Design a protein with these regions (language model features):
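N-terminal leader/domain-start detector
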Residues: 23, 31-34
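Alpha/beta enzyme core
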Residues: 2-8, 12, 24, 37-42, ...
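Acidic, Ser/Thr/Pro-rich intrinsically disordered transcriptional activation regions
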Residues: 19, 26-27
């Protein structure tokens, strides 16, 4: 007489029951394919010149523009949570056509870098975003010609100057985000020629012209004069193979790490980049992705903490070596740092 199981032998049921390994929390932890820990996280921080106390950012609930003093306190807190890295963005008082404040030794980011390094030493990897848009009066990421277009090669010279200023102030990693052709090579030459051979470069290699950056631009008070956009230098969201070309070029120019930005809408890009290269691959869980979770959670529509961890798990599962996220501190606390 045939066994009752014969009808299922082709599928493996019930010999293999997938639910067996899901029946307890301990089993699920033991067999999980992806793990997110505080070690995977990088905290983006904003530091603003000319304020006496931290200022809330309305479109980024829970995130503030720091003073130099308060950003040091926050850096110490991140270190205590076992978060290994932070990245600084500056909001200067004065802006001009060439973004002079970006390379000013007394600029707000340089002061913050120096103060953080003095306070935490090597407990944290201190990164500095390297771009000009926060510092220019026109809002573009580079030097603008009379016709309103960005002059790629003139911008490279400024990027080199900014990189050296950041490294001299204490940045262990500079992170060029302007998407100029040749930016990594120009920065590497500038760093090496001034004695900063050990300063690493995290290249925003695949940075897309995304609609998800709005809250970030509120945080740094940036708008493009005349209502322009950055589509002439940031990547087209419709393109995937182009990202691999950008990444390979940056690595050939000397990038130590590469990054995909945004993360959630570009998980396929993260996965493709991870499969293609042997350097660490970061991903930026950007301001719009964060703000959507916070807004829905405030309305009681979702469990914001659970969704945040699910997002981070998805980004890690796609292949990210580390994740820049505004949820860094909260996630580290939830993960039991």
């Amino acid at each position: 007489m045939p066994s009752p199981n014969d009808a299922f032998s082709g599928s493996g049921f019930p010999t293999r029951r997938m639910r067996r390994l899901r029946r307890s929390g301990a089993l699920r932890r033991l067999t999980a394919e992806t793990h997110v820990s505080p070690d995977d996280l990088v905290a983006p921080l904003f530091v603003r010149q000319g304020i006496d106390e931290p200022q809330p950012i309305a479109s980024l609930p829970g995130v503030v523009q720091h003073t130099v003093e308060s950003v040091v306190i926050e850096a110490k807190r991140l270190a205590s949570l076992q978060i290994p890295a932070l990245i600084l963005f500056g909001v200067p008082l004065v802006r001009d056509a060439v973004g002079s404040a970006a390379s000013d030794p007394d600029g707000v980011v340089q002061r913050a870098l120096s103060s953080i390094r003095d306070a935490v030493g090597d407990e944290l990897v201190v990164m500095a975003d390297l771009c000009l848009d926060e510092y220019t009066d026109h809002g573009h990421c580079g030097i603008v010609r009379d016709d309103g277009t960005v002059d790629n090669d003139a911008t490279l010279e400024r990027y080199g100057e900014v990189a050296v200023a950041q490294a001299r102030a204490g940045a262990g990693v500079v992170a060029p985000s302007g998407m100029m052709d040749g930016q990594v090579a120009a920065i590497r030459r500038s760093l090496d020629s001034t004695g900063f051979e050990e300063t690493a470069i995290l290249a925003y290699s695949a940075k897309y012209a995304s609609a998800l950056y709005g809250p970030f631009r509120d945080a740094v008070d940036v708008t493009i004069v005349g209502g322009g956009d950055r589509r002439a230098y940031q990547q087209d969201s419709r393109n995937a193979r182009e990202a691999l070309a950008e990444v390979r070029l940056d690595i050939a120019e000397g990038a130590d790490m590469v990054m995909v930005k945004p993360a959630l809408a570009y998980l396929d890009i993260i996965s493709s980049v991870r499969a293609a290269v042997d350097v660490p691959v970061g991903a930026y869980h950007v301001s719009g992705e964060y703000a959507m979770v916070k807004a829905a959670a405030e309305r009681g529509w979702i469990d914001g903490d659970a969704v945040a961890l699910e997002h981070l798990g998805a980004i890690k599962r796609a292949g990210a070596s580390f994740i820049l996220t505004y949820f860094a501190a909260a996630a580290a606390e939830a993960l039991g740092a």
